[in-house]
């Protein structure tokens, strides 16, 4: 099979929910990173055969948003385009699937990444289509329902590996939001609230430090936002989800978000609901050599795996095990690691089961501090990993994350 290399990697700054990017159109957001990835690669867009981007919640007026973004970015209409949904893993899946096409000789160049505009996810009235008749109907928050990841249709938390305890009894046979999966992992591993908050604090503090010291400057694509008439455009180029100066005392004051009294998962030790996009140009090593391009990195191997939905946050455990089996690497061989913090408790569960060294993991913050624009995060952590490796002079890194469902 052909060797696959990355020749450019970039991302937008991550917007807070209802923050600076609130009124940004998703297709426009995606086009910004696509255009910049092409520019940084130094290629003619006509050589791009396929554009593959992750997205979990496309706007109804722009299905296959990837295609629209690609055309806006100047990618020729002859290129294919696909929008990939593997929930939180979507952005990484877009890269992996593009890599597979290249490895097997289907084409040589792909533009891959992910995008999400969670501020733009709407409310819906499911019963309105066929008539509400003489009764009130409810506006459904599509974000909240999405965060239940199918458990309204397929409940059964008690069928997972954790079969007893108060949490299981409360949700037996009922749908459950993703925060409950983090509570179950905390229960499984006996993780304390203080341990969870410590990971969240590190994430926020690392994100703040990296921002202040300019560690993200090379990876972030500035976004120019028009203002009211007569005012200069606003430049959005810094992540805005993290809380500056956050302390353990601040986190300790927050109440449980999903289970009263006994819960350990809070808004402060969970990932954010965010807006953002990330992109990279990948190609065969032969094509890069032909074009005289210096790759940013090589994609050496991929692993994957799944687990019961009730502990979905532990899915990096079998995925990493699969990767190690395929490569004969040891976890200690990786000089830097990105493991997305969907929840701080979930991160700790993975850290313990995989045997991660926290000192080299999520060194510039992760989901808790930076935020989690779901369709983009899989690619975002790859982008951030590559830039952190370059800055620190490292040569072998690993990026992994969980996905609900």
Where are these regions (language model features)?
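Active-site pocket-lining segment
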Residues: 180-183, 216-219, 229, 300-369
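Conserved beta-ketoacyl condensing-enzyme motif
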Residues: 22-110, 114-142, 220-236, 310-311, ...
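Flexible glycine-/small-residue-enriched beta->alpha junction loops
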Residues: 109-184
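Short, well-ordered amphipathic alpha-helical segments that serve as non-catalytic structural scaffolds
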Residues: 26-42, 65-69, 94, 178-185, ...
């Amino acid at each position: 099979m052909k060797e696959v290399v990355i020749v450019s990697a970039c991302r937008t700054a991550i917007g807070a929910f209802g923050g600076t990017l609130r009124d940004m159109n998703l297709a426009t957001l995606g086009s910004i990173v696509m255009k910049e990835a092409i520019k940084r690669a130094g290629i003619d867009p006509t050589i791009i055969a396929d554009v593959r981007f992750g997205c979990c919640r496309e706007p109804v007026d722009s299905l296959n948003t990837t295609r629209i973004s690609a055309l806006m970015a100047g990618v020729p209409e002859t290129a294919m385009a696909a929008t990939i949904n593997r929930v939180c893993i979507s952005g990484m899946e877009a890269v992996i699937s593009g890599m597979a096409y290249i490895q097997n000789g289907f084409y040589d160049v792909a533009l891959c990444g992910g995008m999400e505009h969670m501020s733009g996810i709407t409310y819906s009235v499911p019963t309105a289509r066929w008539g509400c008749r003489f009764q009130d109907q409810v506006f459904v928050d599509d974000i909240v329902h999405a965060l239940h990841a199918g458990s309204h249709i397929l409940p059964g938390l008690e069928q997972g590996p954790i079969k007893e305890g108060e949490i299981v009894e409360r949700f037996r046979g009922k749908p459950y939001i993703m925060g409950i999966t983090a509570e179950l992992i905390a229960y499984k591993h006996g993780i304390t609230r203080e341990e969870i908050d410590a990971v969240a604090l590190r994430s926020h503090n690392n994100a703040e430090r990296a921002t202040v010291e300019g560690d993200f400057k090379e990876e972030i694509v500035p976004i120019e936002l028009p203002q009211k008439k007569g005012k200069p455009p606003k430049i959005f180029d810094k992540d805005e989800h993290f809380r500056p100066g956050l302390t353990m005392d601040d986190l300790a004051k927050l109440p449980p978000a999903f289970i009263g009294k006994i819960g350990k998962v809070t808004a402060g030790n969970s990932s954010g609901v965010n807006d953002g996009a990330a992109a990279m140009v990948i190609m065969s090593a032969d094509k890069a050599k032909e074009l005289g391009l210096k790759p940013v990195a090589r994609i050496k191997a991929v692993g994957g795996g799944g687990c019961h939905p009730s502990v979905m946050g532990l899915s990096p455990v079998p995925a990493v095990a699969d990767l190690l089996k395929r490569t004969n690497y040891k976890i200690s061989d990786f000089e830097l690691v990105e493991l997305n913090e969907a929840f701080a408790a979930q991160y700790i569960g993975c850290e313990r089961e995989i045997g991660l060294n926290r000192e080299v993991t999520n060194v510039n913050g992760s989901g808790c501090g930076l935020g989690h624009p779901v369709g983009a995060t899989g690619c975002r952590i790859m982008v951030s990993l590559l830039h952190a490796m370059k800055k620190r002079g490292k040569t072998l890194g690993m990026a992994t994350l969980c996905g609900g469902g």
